[in-house]
Amino acid sequence: VKKRAAFGNPKTARSYASSVYGDCLDIITIQTMPKGRKTVITTVDHKRPDVYQKLLEQVKLGHQAYIVCPFIEDSESERFKDVLSVKTVVDEVQQFLHDNAPMYKADSISGDMKQKDVLAVIDQFARNEIQILVSTTIVEVGVNVPNATAIAVMNADRFGLAALHQLRGRVGRKGDQGSCCLVSDTSNEKLAAMTMFPSGFKIAEVDLQLRGPGDILGSEQTGDSKVVDMILRYPKLAAAIRNYFQTKE
């Protein structure tokens, strides 16, 4: 009998494999951090100038930093008047550096830029020609700059837990202590969970509790489900049902 081992990180890939192979698939979970990696210290902050100062302190130590914003440009809608954009924040940071540390540079990338221009800025950041990179969530995956040790997420309450956890995974990737500032005018269970739990598994559990699983067969991605609720509340019952059908085969 041939045996195969597949390694994957994204939850979608694991879910797909479970759907295709069902009980024929053994899932082994690695719950330890990569060798040399430290838990990213996560805090909630309310004042942007204080956050910029914290990032500058990391830059002065020879490291680099990210700032992530929800919007590319400021919205004209009254509803989103307090939501920060890449264009606003990069202007603020550049002025902050000009006033406090003109030898350092900040720049930005966003989804409305041409791919070659985005890659050019990322390449400069990777070479430490840019010390602070302001962006949308396009840095969430696929960007690996080991020298980056700090990240600030503006209007963090507007992001999902999965996105926040992925974003803080951008820093501290070569063993240096990483830090993540969640900048928000409000405090809620979601942000509290980020400060309390470094584990993606625990973050996923909290996310499930806060949002609900939604439809198993359907399009709703949030809301209560009696079936999933029963499985979560009574794991021994779920295991007994699974064993029953396995023995019948």
Model-derived features: where do they sit?
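Conserved interdomain linker/interface between the two RecA-like ATPase lobes of SF2 helicase motors
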Residues: 23-90
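Conserved beta-strand scaffold positions in the cores of enzyme catalytic domains, especially
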Residues: 4, 25-29, 106-108
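Short amphipathic alpha-helical segments
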Residues: 1, 16-20, 79-80, 144-148, ...
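C-terminal helicase module of SF1/SF2 nucleic-acid helicases/translocases
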Residues: 48-63, 85-249
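Structural beta-sheet core signal
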Residues: 4-6, 67, 180-182
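Conserved H-loop
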Residues: 8-11, 70, 137, 142
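Conserved helicase ATPase motor motifs in RecA-like P-loop NTPase domains
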Residues: 1-21, 33
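Short, charged, surface-exposed secondary-structure boundary motifs
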Residues: 14-16, 37-40, 160-168
